[in-house]
């Protein structure tokens, strides 16, 4: 059977919160089959466990924020994206602040951390959410849609009227049957505009943001001396975010995702719309790994790698 996966050993790292600018300690621990991805605020007087779920996402203005009993964990999307890309089903994430550290602004550090811990298959069937009917959410001209597909593919279009972004391509389509998440998506960094960063800092946000963890643009160009990691890094990062946003549904999706100018809020609304229609999805497993869609029947060390 196609099995669930966790990590083999405990791994730790330290980084800074994008908005607080404060040091954050992050510990990843193995979890039993059926646990899911569980975030734990171990810095609180009584630690609070917050399982990743579509219904636990609260604030989505600047990141995807999990909330429970007054506790929050912000900016979970890059770590969730890495878990999706490596096929991790079960994991405890201990964090000492209300933000996951931003690291280099991509998912690459989390991919490295998980691969360093080692990936272990567990004796339980991997569960998928198979989309059986189209589901769509719109907000003005923005939209996000899930449609039936035997695999996982995404098409994302952005629309930033900026000369540097225009040059790199504003649309990307990826099918993980033939694309490596680790090589083609994981290293894409978050990006922002210099004038917006200044405004955010005045509001007490983005205190940890720098060219070490983001692509920064002025009105005309990219300010980072090292340039871009991918020719189309901007739209690839939006896809990286979407993969993480969608993975909070609790299981990998078997679906085709199409989006135009979508963000954390619209992605979460799409998951809630899906879950509200019980006839739009079903939970499936694969007794024969070879019967699973290409890209999911991976060996124990790589998923979309």
UniProtKB/Swiss-Prot annotation:
Organism listed in the record: Burkholderia ambifaria (strain ATCC BAA-244 / DSM 16087 / CCUG 44356 / LMG 19182 / AMMD)
Lineage, broadest ranks: Bacteria, Pseudomonadati, Pseudomonadota, Betaproteobacteria, Burkholderiales
Physiological role: Catalyzes the hydrolysis of UDP-3-O-myristoyl-N-acetylglucosamine to form UDP-3-O-myristoylglucosamine and acetate, the committed step in lipid A biosynthesis.
InterPro entries in alphabetical order: Ribosomal_Su5_D2-typ_SF, UDP-acyl_GlcNac_deAcase, UDP-acyl_GlcNac_deAcase_C, UDP-acyl_N-AcGlcN_deAcase_N
Top enzyme category: hydrolase
Disulphide-bonded residues: none
Catalytic residues as annotated in Swiss-Prot or TrEMBL: 264 (proton donor)
Protein name as catalogued: UDP-3-O-acyl-N-acetylglucosamine deacetylase
Cofactors demanded by this protein: Zn(2+)
NCBIfam families: lpxC
Gene this chain is encoded by: lpxC
Keywords annotated in UniProt: Hydrolase, Lipid A biosynthesis, Lipid biosynthesis, Lipid metabolism, Metal-binding, Zinc
A single Gene Ontology CC term: membrane
Superkingdom in the source lineage: Bacteria
Protein family according to the UniProt entry: Belongs to the LpxC family.
EC number: 3.5.1.108
Catalytic activity: a UDP-3-O-[(3R)-3-hydroxyacyl]-N-acetyl-alpha-D-glucosamine + H2O = a UDP-3-O-[(3R)-3-hydroxyacyl]-alpha-D-glucosamine + acetate
